[in-house]
Amino acid sequence: MKKILALTLGVAGAGAAAAYLVTDRDTPSSVIASAAAQEAEPVTIWRAPGCGCCDAYAEYLRNNGFKVEVIDDHNFEDRSVEAGVPDRGIGCHLAMIGGYVVSGLVPSEIIERLLEERPEITGITLPGMPANAPGMAAEKSGTLRVYSFGPDGVGVYSDE
């Protein structure tokens, strides 16, 4: 009887040890954070030095899974024109994301859609500094009209 009990306890102990060794002990949040860091889309933002809404927008993008680098640029408007942004479409900063030009405070879900759809355009813009756009407001509210631009001209990309 003692041999059977010892054998049973030995098998149970070995099973528990094996389960411990093969179990992933990372917490779900650390696994998710690690995956998000590996998949973060890099974004470079050129902005007028000291622009507070650009800082808030960069933080907004970071909070939505993008890896953001901000560059102070006294000539970001000239850079915007050189990048193909229409004169009436120049926002408060210029960003390069996934091979696209993004001008202004474009919501992250519209950028994500752009990167998923991969249309044959140069980029998108949210002209001006709408009070309900990310970077100006605590969160996007209401409708924002985002335009696409490229060799075929300018058109509405999104009304969200």
Label each residue range with its predicted role.
Residues 1-4:
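Positively charged n-region of N-terminal signal peptides that target proteins for export
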Residues 36-64:
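Local sequence-structure signature of Cys/Sec-based thiol-disulfide redox active-site neighborhoods
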Residues 42-43, 66-68, 98-101:
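Short active-site oxyanion
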Residues 50, 57, 72-75, 107-111:
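Stable alpha-helical elements in mature extracytoplasmic
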Residues 58-78:
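Conserved helix-turn-beta segment immediately C-terminal to the redox Cys motif
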